[in-house]
UniProtKB/Swiss-Prot annotation:
One of its GO terms (biological process) is neuronal action potential. Coiled coil: none annotated. This is Calcium-activated potassium channel subunit beta-2. It comes from Rattus norvegicus. The gene is Kcnmb2. Pfam families: CaKB (PF03185), KcnmB2_inactiv (PF09303).
Amino acid sequence: MFIWTSGRTSSSYRHDEKRNIYQKIRDHDLLDKRKTVTALKAGEDRAILLGLAMMVCSIMMYFLLGITLLRSYMQSVWTEEAQRALLNVSITETFNCSFSCGPDCWKLSQYPCLQVYVNLTSSGEKLLLYHTEETMKINQKCSYIPKCGNNFEESMSLVSVVMENFRRHQHFPCYSDPEGNQKSVILTKLYSSNVLFHSLFWPTCMMAGGVAIVAMVKLTQYLSLLCERIQRINR
């Protein structure tokens, strides 16, 4: 009786030992699996945050461009581009200006005023040419305004070079108002469609990248859940 009981106890002990070994292996596998899932979840969370941050930054860039560049582009009336013939170019007078010489320091100077008149081919009307839209806002009497500086002779030399370039090229493209409300033409548009495209290109790429990152993470999570459900069904 004693011998039979001892054998049974030994067999039971071996069975329990094997079961403990299998349980430890299974627990170890589950622990590794949980660590892997936790690491993947942390990486997915970081990827989603990156995608959302990219989308928020692109929206902010869209907003800034909308209130600055896009607004000026929509308000511009000089939309018709055509060849214009030079009628007259001359330096008429000088105007006072001020420039910064340091913190809380301003000095007065002068700049020469260059006037350029062109011929409107369709009607033969004489129009004043401006370098850009900002030139007309600064001084409506001048076609080209050099940067205000301490050296007046340097400004005069720069304006003389611009004047000679106009005389050398008698025909050049300009932008005019097709409705005829503005009696002036623009040589260079600061807010053209090409500038608008290049300004909106990078925010659009950032937005597309953020959306793609979030979509890829969500797709990966969906496929992972789908595979897990299939494995449970097969079991």
